[in-house]
From Swiss-Prot:
NCBIfam families: 30S ribosomal protein S12 methylthiotransferase RimO, MiaB/RimO family radical SAM methylthiotransferase. The lineage of its organism: Bacteria, Pseudomonadati, Pseudomonadota, Gammaproteobacteria, Pasteurellales. GO terms for cellular component: cytosol. The keyword Transferase applies. Catalyzes the methylthiolation of an aspartic acid residue of ribosomal protein uS12. This is Ribosomal protein uS12 methylthiotransferase RimO. Residues 378-446 form the TRAM domain. It is an enzyme of class 2 (transferase). [4Fe-4S] cluster 1 binds at C15, C51, C80. Residues 6-116 form the MTTase N-terminal domain.
Length: 446
């Protein structure tokens, strides 16, 4: 049935936001009747959706483009690195076309140009109403906005993806409903700046009452989360910038409407470094808020990311960061050594930190946080949790608790000696038997 259809090869690189863009393009391709294949060999055209956030990601994208050109020869480039067409063509002048991020229509026009759209076939053009998804069937990313209004000095995202542009709340909720109807058990809300949702709209628009499913709602983040919480699935928030109104989300978590999980990138704890980064600078206020959040929602899991070795970071600045970790006792933490990014203000700042110092600070940071994370997980031993199954194999079951986002957090390894019938996407009850620095181990509760 599909052998005569034109074949499109597809490579998706980068973060979950880019993954959502890839899903959108793949959905359009399938709707137009193209066959998606995982290899270069038999492809009539290859699309590479690139990442350009840091220099290592740029290099990975350029290598992927080069490999596609070498193996196939007909390549269209899109995504974040596509915003720097000159950079791409300097290395790979033979690419057919280049577009920037979220340029779905342009990508499809280019595909039609080089590989004409096949005749409509109702059996082939049929696409699930939730669209093509690259994640397992039981979870999906829901992108609520594009771009960012912040100008952090280490970041070039606004130059590639533009200023904040929020989707309408009814559009977001319609997509979420389709995902749930398709069997999704966990929705992961993503954007460049999730807590800024709808702040690009006027006050009048934000306060305007709209109707969804017959219910009056406001066009803001709190209303969005309240409605998502009524869909009967796990709802997890990522990339939450620490605006004051984030405090209003915590009661929703305490009430079980959305998962008690906040992915809130703090980046540093030194006021001097935060100012240089153009990030919120009151770390004392942040600690006060964390304490209050945990009082309201004791089960709250806090994830954050930090940068060590930022230009001008002294040993004193770094010690402030370590002191913050000891006091905040965050559950999940990612750490990155500052990486110069072409076009970022911080790349040109004076007092660049030597690589060996960055490396040493990174290891000191990770060693401390590993001890904190291990102690936090140890507190869960002996307790009973509901977990969502990701995989089942001969060795047992791999699942995640409400504290574990896919790909970036730990997992729960569950013994299943009696081969109890369990499948991916199922919620099960387990008792935690032990813990290490990142993962939990558990037994099934019949």
């Amino acid at each position: 049935m599909t052998s005569s259809l034109p074949n499109i090869g597809f490579i998706s690189l980068g973060c979950p936001k880019n993954l959502v863009d890839s899903e959108r393009i793949l959905t359009e391709l399938r709707s137009d009747g193209y066959n998606i294949i995982p290899s270069y060999e038999n492809a009539d055209l290859v699309i590479v959706n690139t990442c350009g956030f840091i220099d290592s990601a740029v290099q990975e994208s350029l290598e992927a483009i080069g490999e596609a050109l070498e193996e196939n020869g007909k390549v269209i480039v899109t995504g974040c690195l596509g915003a720097k067409e000159d950079r791409i063509r300097e290395v790979h002048p033979k690419v057919l076309e280049v577009t920037g991020p979220h340029s779905y229509e342009a990508v499809m026009q280019q595909v039609h140009k080089y590989v004409p759209k096949p005749a409509y076939n109702p059996y082939v053009n049929l696409v699930p109403k939730q669209g093509v998804k690259l994640t397992p069937k039981h979870y999906a990313y829901l992108k609520i906005s594009e771009g960012c209004d912040h100008r952090c000095t280490f970041c070039i995202i606004p130059s590639m993806r533009g200023d904040l542009d929020s989707r309408s709340i009814t559009q977001v909720l319609d997509e979420a409903k389709r995902l749930v109807e398709a069997g999704v058990k966990e929705i992961l809300v993503v954007s460049q700046d999730t807590s800024a949702y709808a702040l690009d709209r006027s006050k009048e628009e934000q306060n305007k009452t709209v109707f969804w499913n017959g219910m009056p709602i406001k066009n803001n983040l709190i209303s969005l989360c309240e409605q998502l919480g009524k869909l009967g699935v796990w709802v997890r928030l990522h990339y939450v910038y620490p605006y004051p109104h984030v405090d209003q989300l915590i009661p929703l978590m305490a009430e079980g409407k959305i998962l008690p999980y906040l992915d809130i990138p703090l980046q540093h704890a030194s006021p001097k470094i935060l100012k240089a980064m153009k990030r919120p600078g009151s770390i004392e206020r942040t600690l006060e808020r964390i304490k209050k959040w945990r009082e309201i929602c004791p089960d709250l899991t806090l994830r954050s990311t930090f940068i060590v070795g930022f230009p001008g970071e002294s040993e004193e600045d770094f010690q402030l960061l370590l002191d913050f970790l000891k006091e905040a006792l965050l559950d999940r933490v990612g750490c990155f050594k500052f990486s110069p990014v072409e076009g970022a203000i911080a790349t040109e700042m004076p007092d660049q930190v030597p690589e060996e110092v960055k490396e040493a600070r990174f290891h000191r940071f990770m060693q401390l946080q590993q001890e904190i994370s291990a102690a936090r997980l140890q507190q869960k031993v002996g307790k009973v949790f509901t977990v969502l199954v990701d995989e089942v194999d001969e060795e047992g079951i791999i699942a995640r608790s409400i504290a574990d986002a896919p790909e970036i957090d730990g997992v729960v390894y569950i013994d299943n000696p009696n081969r109890v019938a369990v499948k991916a996407g199922q919620f099960i009850e387990v008792k935690i038997t032990r813990a290490d620095a990142y993962d939990l181990y558990a037994s099934l509760i019949n």
